[in-house]
Amino acid sequence: MENYQKIEKIGEGTYGVVYKARELTHPNRIVALKKIRLEAEDEGVPSTAIREISLLKEMNDPNIVRLLNIVHADGHKLYLVFEFLDLDLKKYMEALPVSEGGRGRALPDGSTLSRNLGLGDAMVKKFMAQLIEGIRFCHSHRVLHRDLKPQNLLIDRDGNLKLADFGLARAFGVPLRTYTHEVVTLWYRSPEILLGGRQYSTGVDMWSCGAIFAEMCTRKPLFPGDSEIDEIFKIFRILGTPDETIWPGVTSFPDFKPTFPKWKREDIQNVVPGLEEDGLDLLEALLEYDPARRISAKQACMHPYFQHGSSYYSGRARRNGFH
């Protein structure tokens, strides 16, 4: 760790403390140091985790927070060195004026982002394009996120959104609680995971993307459950209780109960008022119960909501087209 000088603690992530630090070999480079707290501290870092994380260093995409380095210290400590961004989507939404559905909170100290960016329709579309393109890139490399939420969507000084923590779930698992014993949020978790499914795929990230989309539009979480069953019921109350006709195989999930209340589906237009028709169509495609029919990131990039293609709105057209 001699190459890094910690400046301050900036947060407590799912896996451990996050520091703002200076890279001493490049004195002008500020980085985020994520200290990964491993379950079995005495056993050292599992080689599988090191392998998984090493693969993430190769993930280079403008929509992904860049993993710059992996530092293995004292045998059982692991630090991940990421590019530094001081703002996340949760804080960004909270900083919006109360008149725009935010809480008028101050941006983090030293945040260089202009306060007047707001979160109007065009900004939501841009953030969605960047989010979906980032997910598409990761899925094309067979990497899932599994824990997408506004807290790990970071925003740079130019008002561009980048995905953080991609691939960490596979390396370290998704804990039920953070290392400080805070409960990991369930608000963005897909129904197949909540119902105890063991086999899941890229659709889990697309569901999270839908919940985040709705929250950007309304400034309120769509399914703010405070336990697994409350989360399931919050979903059922809005989207209706699924059955075999809507979601073939749903009754076979380990945690599905035939005694679940039978709620009718709400009109999505009433849930997210003001969202344009193509946006509502994309939202419904993201919040499709059946993961086999849920829209993929690749399909979402070409959805009519992004009339000119997602790269037009993300502002991040790639030289060599899509991966």
Curated annotation (Swiss-Prot):
Keywords carried by this UniProt record: ATP-binding, Cell cycle, Cell division, Kinase, Mitosis, Nucleotide-binding, Phosphoprotein, Serine/threonine-protein kinase, Transferase
Domain (Protein kinase): residue spans on this chain: 4-306
Record bears the keyword Zinc-finger: no
Active site (record annotation): D147 (proton acceptor)
Family listed: Belongs to the protein kinase superfamily. CMGC Ser/Thr protein kinase family. CDC2/CDKX subfamily.
A GO MF term: cyclin-dependent protein serine/threonine kinase activity
Name of encoding gene: nimX
PANTHER family (alphabetical): CELL DIVISION PROTEIN KINASE, CYCLIN-DEPENDENT KINASE 2
SUPFAM superfamilies linked to this entry: Protein kinase-like (PK-like)
Domain of life: Eukaryota
Name the UniProt record assigns to this protein: Cyclin-dependent kinase 1
UniProt catalytic activity: L-seryl-[protein] + ATP = O-phospho-L-seryl-[protein] + ADP + H(+); L-threonyl-[protein] + ATP = O-phospho-L-threonyl-[protein] + ADP + H(+)
E.C. number: 2.7.11.22
UniProt keyword Nucleotidyltransferase, yes or no: no
Lineage of source species: Eukaryota, Fungi, Dikarya, Ascomycota, Pezizomycotina
Chain positions found as Phosphotyrosine: Y15
Assigned GO CC terms: cyclin-dependent protein kinase holoenzyme complex; cytoplasm; nucleus; spindle pole body
UniProt activity-regulation remark: Phosphorylation at Thr-14 or Tyr-15 inactivates the enzyme, while phosphorylation at Thr-180 activates it.
GO biological process, one term: signal transduction
Function description: Cyclin-dependent kinase that acts as a master regulator of the mitotic and meiotic cell cycles.
